Amino acid sequence: MSYPQGYLYQPSASLALYSCPAYSTSVISGPRTDELGRSSSGSAFSPYAGSTAFTAPSPGYNSHLQYGADPAAAAAAAFSSYVGSPYDHTPGMAGSLGYHPYAAPLGSYPYGDPAYRKNATRDATATLKAWLNEHRKNPYPTKGEKIMLAIITKMTLTQVSTWFANARRRLKKENKMTWTPRNRSEDEEEEENIDLEKNDEDEPQKPEDKGDPEGPEAGGAEQKAASGCERLQGPPTPAGKETEGSLSDSDFKEPPSEGRLDALQGPPRTGGPSPAGPAAARLAEDPAPHYPAGAPAPGPHPAAGEVPPGPGGPSVIHSPPPPPPPAVLAKPKLWSLAEIATSSDKVKDGGGGNEGSPCPPCPGPIAGQALGGSRASPAPAPSRSPSAQCPFPGGTVLSRPLYYTAPFYPGYTNYGSFGHLHGHPGPGPGPTTGPGSHFNGLNQTVLNRADALAKDPKMLRSQSQLDLCKDSPYELKKGMSDI
């Protein structure tokens, strides 16, 4: 930057940068020499009049102008008059180009402030660890102790609180907890301690549940390896019963067949209470009026409740004949789905086996209608024989509520009716002569097939029955997704 000769440059911005006071009249009207005014370099390199920059040759540049003694003294006096006395103005000092020992512009930024340090130093960590080791029984410093530690470690209160919260969490993960978690009034610790309490209450129960092979937390390999009948006859754990209450409405339905009602003499289950005991007893006493002749089973009757009975109540899961029946004990949805998904292979292997061979649960609407048809049919003993029960065991979705039956699937989903899901039309009368032809557009193919199955027990081993069972995992998953 160059200015014309004789121009007095007043760098207010530059002086403000270095926190210098404003010009005084003595400086502006102070003694100036003609040489300084005429100097081309004086105005360019010296931001204020009378600077000592050119008193002697400086290392930054070589001045062609040498001041005499009097102008130099006057310039030094003028320079110190407004810059201040703490600076030593030697004759060879470059006033404007030298590096000043102070940095006023950086004063507003807390670069050296320990409160803004991100990581704790080793000394601070050692101090906090020492306090923690002394208070392992109660590693919750009070407000006063936090303030004391913050002063000692030059950290903020928030940093101290966070350090102790992390230290407690770290000790808990390493199973070195020697204290009882408690709630604190501090906001930063309240949620963490509540979580710790919940985890401590749950942890003692987890080993017990895992130790019980029948519990829902048991390994999936053990349950899948066991056969369907053996896996379902054992008594459930209390944890299994807790899931019954929420899942029983749509998942654990009692198939309304007489063969199932004969199973009320099975072994009672032990465990928590269940509201379905009276309903199961009512089913045993009065099975017939719920489904009149000629009508399919539309869904569960209000009293035809859920599979899980009350404490000491009879189990509705086992059929009377010696061969163990496949039925679903009250299990969480996960195990029911896993069992049904792996059971279609069992059907293919044991399709021509003995009469009591396990068969996977069939879709709810079809099974319910088939059972309804069996009640209305004049065949002598289709529903009492174990072979009649095999294609329709007490699955998790047997006799689903009304909104799971066929009219609702094409109406509210993209899957059409059940006839498209099953491979071929079943034998039987025409589409208008089925027992449930009045039931609001129910798929007649399904009704006819169910009626034919109920009237002819020999057809239970046919391909139609295998198709019904084979499609069950798909429809079960479809039904579960709507719950």
UniProtKB/Swiss-Prot annotation:
UniProt-reported outcome of changing A150P: In HMMS; hypomorphic mutation
Compositional bias per record (Basic and acidic residues), positions renumbered to this chain: 204-213, 250-261
Domain of life: Eukaryota
Induction of the gene: Down-regulated by 1,25-dihydroxyvitamin D3 in prostate cancer samples from patients assigned to receive weekly high-dose 1,25-dihydroxyvitamin D3 before radical prostatectomy. Also down-regulated by 1,25-dihydroxyvitamin D3 in the human androgen-sensitive prostate cancer cell line LNCaP and in the estrogen-sensitive breast cancer cell line MCF-7.
InterPro entries xref list: HD (IPR001356), Homeobox_CS (IPR017970), Homeodomain-like_sf (IPR009057), Iroquois_homeo (IPR003893), KN_HD (IPR008422)
Sequence positions bearing Phosphoserine: S274, S464
Composition-biased stretches (Low complexity): 266-282, 374-388
Record key words, sorted: Disease variant, DNA-binding, Homeobox, Intellectual disability, Nucleus, Phosphoprotein, Sensory transduction, Transcription, Vision, Vitamin D
PROSITE patterns: HOMEOBOX_1, HOMEOBOX_2
GO MF annotation terms: DNA-binding transcription factor activity, RNA polymerase II-specific; DNA-binding transcription factor binding; identical protein binding; RNA polymerase II cis-regulatory region sequence-specific DNA binding; sequence-specific double-stranded DNA binding; vitamin D binding
Protein name, as recorded: Iroquois-class homeodomain protein IRX-5
Gene behind the chain: IRX5
